Amino acid sequence: MTVYLEDLQVGMSASLTHTVTEHDIELFGQATGDRNPVHFDEEFAKKTIFRGRVAHGALLVGYVSAVIGNQLPGPGTIFGGAAMEFKAPLRLGDTVTVTCTVRSIEGRKVTLDCISRVGETV
């Protein structure tokens, strides 16, 4: 689905829900070359502030990109930049929901607020 610029309205939103799998983490590590053991080695990860394996932060950013590129506004959209804050780690087995909402439209520039949730944790 593509929402054309002239059809966008402040408050419109779209979401994606995905459960993070071992396969997701492995493919992301292969694609990016990020083999940080905090993502792959449980014994190593237990000794970190995370106390266990976590998904790549950029994997979560990829889910945001999927909402923007596939749903709102959709195909043809250029993801021009982002300011992000990670409040909690994303873990193997977590089901995350990413919701993007149109905050403002200025000419051809659209600003979205995107929030990810795992259960009740934002």
Model-predicted regions and their roles:
Residues M1-T77:
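Hot-dog-fold acyl-thioester-processing enzymes
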